[in-house]
């Protein structure tokens, strides 16, 4: 699944967004996906083959997240679309408004909290 050491090599990154003072001038896209494009494969490689995908359980619509991330990592965009659309009729809409409860279910998130706890933060 993806890159076995991806979660060790790459930190979590989010796409950049336009400054709100620029956003209010029009109704255009404010997430700068073009700049993030080269990082998509890197970020999808962070998905581990954890055995029990708690992220899948945490998703209210049941998206098959590990398989989707693997398809993105391999540049299999049609397969990724098929995986998403098998559980979600409108992934292009829900992806914009989703609060990402899968991330809190991810084993990486659990380990991050634990490591911060041990550091006394």
Q: Which residues does each PLM region occupy?
A:
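Ferredoxin-type iron-sulfur electron-transfer modules and their immediate structural context
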Residues: 1-121
């Amino acid at each position: 699944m993806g890159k076995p050491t991806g979660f060790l090599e790459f930190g979590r990154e989010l796409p950049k967004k336009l400054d709100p003072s620029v956003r209010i001038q029009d109704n255009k896209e404010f997430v700068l996906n073009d700049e993030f494009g080269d990082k998509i494969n890197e970020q999808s490689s962070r998905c581990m083959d954890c055995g029990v995908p708690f992220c899948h359980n945490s998703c209210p619509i049941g998206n098959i997240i590990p398989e989707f991330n693997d398809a993105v990592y391999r540049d299999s965009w049609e397969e990724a679309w098929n995986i998403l659309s098998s559980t979600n009729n409108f992934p292009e809409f829900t992806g914009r408004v989703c609060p990402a409860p899968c991330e809190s279910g991810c084993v990486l998130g659990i380990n991050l909290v634990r490591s911060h706890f041990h550091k006394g933060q």
